[in-house]
A protein has these predicted regions:
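Structural signature of tandem alpha-helical TPR/SEL1-like repeats
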Residues: 44-52, 78-90, 111-124, 145-158, ...
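Alpha-helical segment of the N-proximal tetratricopeptide repeat
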Residues: 32-56, 60, 77, 107, ...
Length: 345
């Protein structure tokens, strides 16, 4: 057996030490590369690639950067709120003083329909840094989810006080006022939205609802038609102005005119039971019975506890001489109406 000399052994040790010293630098360089690529992907709007790259950067050097926060931001853009929540909880555990992570986590919990938890996180975040108008907007919307409109209005008012040009905060404040039948305040809020954006279809549609509640049908119809025209060409059209226009035409006994906007409402809001109910009712009134049955049955599948849907189904089955089904639906209507009456304070 041959033994290395002392010089040989010291040389090997020196080489090993150099390699050990190089490993952290190589890891750091690799982490920096993945992080930088993630930032580039994020800024270019490639959020799927960004989320993957930030995850790799975090795996290489756990807890040393804000890669988890950027990964969460990427996942929010991808509407993957559950994964975003996981990333933010990990980061907040390692960095409990990060107001950025907490505010984003509060938003994510709101989007997951967890308002109580969202409010708890916003309270923690506010202890670290004062909230922005957008933050207070989400706090207000958490209270909307909790059906607490008094507190919703309180925080939405604070949001627009802090950020008077926050169009979305003004819009949601208008909606909260409308839910409390504070029509004057609601109108002012929606008019403020239109002052900030003169072709905001949501605000114009809601002005139509106010006009309709004030028994001004012609002005309401005009507002709904404006909202439809203003959102035309948008990649994210809402079914609401079509639904509101068609519903008002039905109330005015103009069922033939109501069919077209209600068909468009169904096209845009295929999972909205009200759209199927209203177009089914329009078909029933224009004697298009098979189509009425189809739409009303779809509405019932989407919202089986809605008494109005069961009542219209009973009418269509009776008209089509399906008497057993008609009796069942009339009975179901009475049951749901009795239950609703019994639950009122």
């Amino acid at each position: 057996m041959m033994y290395k000399s002392g010089n040989d052994r010291s040389g090997v040790l020196r080489c090993g030490l150099v390699l050990l010293l190089l490993i952290p630098f190589r890891c750091a360089a690799q982490m920096d590369t993945e992080y930088a690529r993630g930032v580039t992907a994020f800024r270019s709007g490639d959020y799927a690639a960004a989320a993957d790259l930030f995850a790799k950067a975090e795996a290489i050097a756990p807890g040393t950067t804000d890669a988890l926060v950027y990964q969460a931001k990427s996942l929010v853009h991808l509407q993957n709120f559950s994964a975003a929540e996981s990333s933010l909880f990990r980061y907040a555990t390692l960095h409990p003083d990060s107001n950025e992570a907490l505010y984003l986590l509060g938003f994510v919990l709101h989007r997951e329909n967890r308002p109580k938890e969202s409010l708890e996180i916003y309270t923690k975040a506010a202890a670290l840094k004062p909230p922005t108008g957008d933050d207070l907007k989400i706090v207000g919307l958490d209270y909307v989810l909790l059906n607490d409109y008094a507190d919703a209005i309180k925080w939405l008012e604070k949001a627009v006080e802090l950020d008077p040009e926050n169009k979305d905060a003004w819009y949601y404040l208008g909606r909260a006022y409308y839910s409390r039948t504070s029509l004057s305040e609601s109108r002012k809020a929606f008019q403020t939205v239109l002052g900030l954006d003169p072709r905001d279809a949501r605000a114009e549609n809601n002005l139509g609802l106010i006009l309709e509640s004030e028994a001004k049908p012609d002005e309401a119809l005009d507002a709904y038609r404006k909202a439809i025209a203003w959102q035309d060409g948008s990649p994210h059209q809402s079914e609401q102005p079509y639904l509101n226009l068609g519903s008002l035409l039905l109330e005015l006994d103009r069922a033939g005119e109501a069919v077209s906007p209600l068909e468009k409402a169904v096209e845009l809001g295929a999972n909205n039971a009200s759209c199927h109910l209203k177009v089914g009712t329009a078909y029933l009134r224009t004697n298009r019975l098979p189509e009425a049955q189809r739409e009303l049955e779809k509405a019932e599948r989407l919202e089986s506890e809605n008494a109005a849907i069961h009542y219209q189904l009973a009418r269509i089955y009776k008209q089509m001489h399906q008497m057993d089904k008609a009796r069942f639906e009339f009975q179901r209507t009475e049951e749901l109406q009795s239950r609703a009456a019994g639950s009122r304070p």
